[in-house]
Amino acid sequence: MTSEGVRPAMPDGVKSGSLGLVAVFTATTFLSALLLFSVQPLFTKMVLPVLGGSPSVWAVALCFFQGALLAGYCYAHLLNGFVPARAAGWVHLVLCGLALLALPISLPSGWTEPPPGDPYLWQLGLYTVAIGLPFLAVSANAPLLQAWFAATGHPAGRDPYFLYAASNLGSLIALLGYPFVLEPTFGARTLADLWAVGFIALLIAIAICFLTLRGRAVSSLSTSDQAAGTPAEAPTWSRRVGWVGLALVPSALLTAFTTHISTDVASAPLLWVLPLSLYLLTFVIVFRERALIPMRMLLALHLAAVVVALLQLSQTRHGGWVISSLTGVAVFFTSALVAHRTLYDLRPAPRYLTEFYLWLSLGGVLGGLFAALIAPKLFSEVFEYPLLLALTMACRPGALNVSIRNRDELLRLWLIGASGLLALYWVPVLLGQLPTSGLEGLWGDLANRLNRLVNRWGEAALLTLAFSVLLLLSFRHPPRQALIALLMFLAVVMLPSGVKRGEAQRSYFGVYRVALSSDGDFHILTHGTTLHGA
């Protein structure tokens, strides 16, 4: 179902319904998000003295938070599906009460020193023991409160997804407020106590929302669907897979981009705050009936950003960290905007709201698992970053709309893929033979200039440039664009480039690389952006 299938009713609700009801649910959702995203930097900063400042600390932490969010959404979906709305609140309030036993937040005894080796699982266990229950209780609120609001019978409940934008706005404020306001003003212990107070306030607000729900006439989401006059069509499995994929790619890109900038661009405290803030901001911008940025403009900006980013990664000699950072921010932000807007356009009727968020969260978890746990074992360098940049082209509307019955289009895609793979193999071979091929006498200065161009930029950059021209010419064919973007990724990781330099080994603590110096006289050892010697 597209965005035209479910018409938001927020303006009508404001006119004909009670502003107080909207305000109560919005404020509760906002407070829940504040707590949800303030506990993440709070506890991670407590863990840093134990595990150090490796990029993997935040990557694994993000993986845990995505997994716990999935558990919370699963709990909310089961609660909404199997417990009547007027009784579900009692169950949720009991869970919140049990979570109080884990407060205030602190490092549990017996978890002060990780075991030898890569402490991936140990860190996940630490987070589960210390903040698992409170995080589960808070994470369930976003879909649960939206489902409750839809069940109140309020006119705005016909499309309660606007509450999700309020939730992400609260998350964004918490995330930015922690490093710049809260942490400099209060210590970790005081912040943990304040978080406990905020949790109690949230429990009271949830109770108010629940009692308000019990006092309303509407008791089910199916009634809300009927009142809206929209058929509550059950989502198909292809639609569910689409939800997962559209959530997976930007989620994995969030972790991959954070790892990339902290490994290959610059290392700085709290560097992860910017990508996560931008990720949350994308929901605020596009998870609404009328996105703040038109989709046509988003698609154009995204296409340009992906091309520029992959071209930059293909160069063995690229610009400084400022240019790399700005390019990375632009491509990550536009990619997440496009994926999340497409996700919003595919949202279901309110009856399937909690299921929608469950699949969305599953995609987030799978993306986090891939980028945080699988990719470091699979790749010797941060190859997942250019891979995910290419995959964002598959998140554009119509990118996967290729029918097996359309033999002509399938043939074109096969020809593009086969030609691209042949070019990836033969072009470097031919360019390597250029100085001794005798072409200098035939072409004169042209061959010499081409040779200098290859020596300066490398085969990967030249091939990526050629693929990018083909990609831009295919602007009316999203499936072809997605395939060509994958060819650009292969050029970046198969040939010497900005992410493939020398010999590398990767571990929990980063990427160790041995490569030639810029003048070619020495072999140098680097760990991320740190030079350890020659």
Q: Where in this protein do the model-derived segments appear?
A:
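Alpha-helical transmembrane segments of multi-pass membrane proteins
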Residues: T2-A534
